[in-house]
């Protein structure tokens, strides 16, 4: 078998701690800049490639269904709203002050997808057993080719770098189980999901299929209707409160925690508090008045919420 190129071999090795710490320092220092200044964090293409290569190996070493323990903080969609990601860490504590699980959709729509994903990958490498990232439906080439990440990579670097991110995203895990009681994913449950071993056995790297279990985990939505229904997104299904209750009872769990939908208060319960949606990008896309939220789960599995309020609408003349 042909040897892998030396450059790729080199990148897969653990990053020098000093290099990693310097990347994190530059990314976090951004919080001292004036909001709306348009300033970007400068990372080299080589540094970003190494973040992708090293984190990808960690994702593949860890299971596709992460088994985690409380206490832990859970964050929903970020969508390139980098200043808001830093605000979440200011509220919850910068790693390793707290354990974190992010539910996907790091890129697209916002202005700083690159800073957002680079800081998250850097923390994953620095704290692999305390910091966890799931895959969202936007961590997919067919989606982020359209909704902004491809254009940001091309404008700031090149298309090659976007392809390297695609390879990394194809290795992200798709679900997490907290203390055997709380199941977390980006989208929701699937009519095909009969056993958690189905998630454990999904081979990676993989692209997100157009239908089936993985597609549903990343795309499905709760609905006021009963049973399984057609999803307005044109992908996957909707599921009623009856399906949530049925799933939790069958698997002896208490709660499903997911993201994927903008909710006004940053979090919203469904199915008599058996499912919660967490969305962490306030003033989403500058078009919504929503708050963002982070869910904290303590050792006794009590859930509480920290809220990022939407900013006041500023008059353009002030």
UniProtKB/Swiss-Prot annotation:
Binds 2 manganese ions per subunit. The active site is at residue 138. Its main location: nucleus. PROSITE patterns: SER_THR_PHOSPHATASE. SMART domains: PP2Ac. The keyword Methyltransferase does not apply. It is an enzyme of class 3 (hydrolase). Its EC number is 3.1.3.16. Mn(2+) 2 binds at residues 105, 137, 186, 260. This is Serine/threonine-protein phosphatase PP1 isozyme 1. It comes from Arabidopsis thaliana. The gene is TOPP1.
């Amino acid at each position: 078998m042909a040897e892998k190129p030396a450059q790729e071999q080199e990148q897969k090795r653990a990053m020098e701690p000093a290099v990693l710490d310097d990347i994190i320092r530059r990314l976090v220092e951004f919080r001292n800049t004036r909001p709306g200044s348009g300033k970007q964090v400068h990372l080299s293409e080589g540094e970003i490639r190494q973040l992708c290569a090293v984190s990808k190996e960690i994702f593949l070493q860890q299971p596709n269904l992460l088994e985690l323990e409380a206490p832990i903080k859970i964050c929903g969609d970020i969508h390139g709203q980098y200043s808001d990601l830093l605000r979440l860490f200011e509220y919850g504590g910068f790693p390793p002050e707290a354990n974190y699980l992010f539910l996907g959709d790091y890129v697209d729509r916002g202005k700083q997808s690159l800073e957002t994903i680079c800081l998250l990958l850097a923390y994953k490498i620095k704290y692999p057993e305390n910091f966890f990232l799931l895959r969202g439906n936007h961590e997919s080439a067919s989606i982020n080719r359209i909704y902004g990440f491809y254009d940001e990579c091309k404008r700031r670097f090149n298309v090659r770098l976007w392809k390297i991110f695609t390879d990394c995203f194809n290795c992200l895990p798709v679900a997490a189980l907290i203390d055997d009681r709380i199941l977390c994913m980006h989208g929701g449950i699937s009519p095909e999901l009969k056993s958690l071993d189905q998630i454990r056995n999904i081979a990676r790297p993989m692209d997100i299929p157009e239908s089936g279990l993985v597609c549903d985990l990343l795309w499905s939505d709760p609905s006021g209707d009963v049973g399984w229904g057609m999803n307005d997104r044109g992908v996957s299904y909707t599921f009623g409160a009856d399906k949530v209750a049925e799933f939790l009872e069958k698997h002896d769990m208490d709660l499903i925690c997911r993201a994927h939908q903008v909710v006004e208060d940053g979090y919203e319960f469904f199915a008599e508090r058996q499912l919660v949606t967490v969305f962490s990008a306030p003033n989403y896309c500058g078009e919504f008045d929503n708050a963002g939220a982070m869910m904290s789960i303590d050792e006794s599995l009590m859930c509480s919420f920290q809220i990022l309020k939407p900013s006041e609408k500023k008059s353009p003349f002030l």
